[in-house]
Design a protein with these regions (language model features):
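Active-site lumenal/periplasmic loops and adjacent helix-entry segments of GT-C-fold
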Residues: 46-188
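Catalytic-core regions of glycoside hydrolase
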Residues: 187-191, 211
Length: 211
């Protein structure tokens, strides 16, 4: 019986440490995922057109019906590295004979003041296409999870388990995962949660966090 209590106490202490250092651990997790070029892209679908070769798939399988991602957004972002006007230029003539504003077409990564407000594209600018894609996918999922966990802590008066459940339900909702890479849906949920949290922090509250 004492051994069981010790295990429970050890687990509780472990979870408390994770909670205490959640931001540091999340950042380290992001670094690891980006280092190994991990993403949820369905770029493996290009194998259907390019023939046999290493697909790079380690878990799951590419989803053909997510063509807005692997057939449009991701190739456009990759194209930016090879922009004939300079890597990640705001304008491009790579396709077509006239200048195209890359910030207006799917909001592609560009060396432009507007990209300061699009941190999930910074990976492309600093790490290149492969790790930029990983940064785009992993940073959005991690920040989405954290922001909704913090919002859950406010909504539930500091109940960690309920907050984790809320964060999981939002982050892995089928509708959200279907449109995860495009349409700015993830960013909308992140900024919405952060906006509420900022407003909460600006106003004194008597709520106390608890287990």
């Amino acid at each position: 019986m004492n051994e069981k209590k010790q295990k429970q106490r050890g687990l509780k202490q472990g979870f408390e440490l994770i909670y205490k250092y959640r931001f540091v651990l999340s950042f380290l997790l992001l670094i690891m995922l980006v280092s190994f070029k991990i993403s949820g892209s369905s770029m493996g679908c290009w194998k259907l057109f390019l023939g046999d070769g290493e697909s790079g798939i380690r878990l799951g399988e590419p989803r053909v019906w997510r063509s807005d991602e692997w057939g449009t957004l991701t190739p456009l972002c990759f194209r930016q590295q090879y922009n004939t006007l300079g890597a990640y230029n705001r304008y491009s003539q790579t396709l077509g004979s006239i200048l195209t504003d890359n910030m207006l077409v799917y909001g592609q990564p560009s060396w432009d003041i507007l990209t300061l407000f699009r941190p999930f594209y910074w990976g492309y600018l600093f790490f290149g296409s492969e790790r930029g894609l990983s940064w785009f996918w992993c940073s959005r999922l991690i920040v989405l999870f954290l922001s909704w966990f913090e919002l859950g802590m406010f909504i539930t008066d500091g109940k960690k388990k309920l907050s984790v459940m809320l964060s999981v339900c939002v982050s892995f909702a089928p509708f959200l995962q279907w449109w995860f890479a495009i349409n700015g849906l993830v960013e909308m949920l992140i900024y919405g949660a952060c906006f509420v949290l900022v407003q909460v922090c600006r106003k004194p509250s008597g709520r106390q966090r608890s287990d």
